[in-house]
């Protein structure tokens, strides 16, 4: 059997981690249906899930960027890749900020 790739998954909210409510989709502190879906990937990947926070990305600010960067910096070692889930409203801003905050991170 091939070695499983080790993936660090950091969830921050957004639609991917939302749950339906009578008022529409809402952030879910447990990542919505995402954790259950991860079980399907267990044959090929060893996934470490860190639910960092659960907010609408329209509310993402530099304070959250720092928290995401800190989480990646403190936890990336020993992993083959890092995945950060994020809503689409401010994803480009967060991605840009993290690029500058995490220079030399040699992981996809």
Predicted regions and their residues:
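N-terminal glycine-rich anion-binding loop in soluble enzyme alpha/beta folds
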Residues: 2-76
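Hydrophobic structural segments
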Residues: 71, 75-77, 90, 96
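Structural motif
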Residues: 80-81
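Short Gly/Thr/Asp-enriched flexible loops that form oxyanion-binding sites at enzyme active sites
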Residues: 84-107
